[in-house]
């Protein structure tokens, strides 16, 4: 650990964020909501702009082209044909990772974030392991995930910058 800290100091790295992993620790009975749908290829430009509003460009690691390839793993909520909430996930052989979720304020439906999360669970019933990373200071997100049945494990993802 001391060697790691020395390397960071010598190379002028500063810790900018610490994300902690959370895993779903309960059986779920997901429900689908009629106002949530899968993203379409023609949504990709709008999705890219939508997520860039909410996430630092250093953290939102999808290019517009990458996002187009992720379309089958993106869920959206639209009002007046505009994307107002979305969730991106990744499937692996034994787990599902929630990559990003963002929800506009003042929506017609008040439970859109919960509905997106439930749709994500329902779309991935073949896989029982659900994981995500959350910024350790984002108490609103942490509380939301805890209410959904997620809990912290011991894995941290630290972000550093030297510029």
How would you label these PLM feature ranges?
Residues 17-18, 84-85, 113, 154:
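A structural microfeature
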Residues 59-102:
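A conserved beta-strand-loop-helix scaffold within acyl/acetyltransferase catalytic domains
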Residues 127-129:
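Short, high-confidence coil segments that cap the C-terminus of an alpha-helix
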Residues 1-5, 131-142, 158-163:
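Conserved beta-strand-loop-alpha-helix junction that forms the acyl-donor binding cleft
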Residues 1-33, 156-161:
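Acyl-donor-binding surface of acyltransferase catalytic domains
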Residues 39, 101-103, 134:
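Hydrophobic adenine-recognition pocket in adenosine-nucleotide-binding enzymes
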Residues 19, 29-58:
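Short amphipathic alpha-helix that is part of the acyltransferase structural core
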Residues 103, 109-122, 142-147:
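Conserved acetyl-CoA-binding loop-helix of GNAT-fold acetyltransferases
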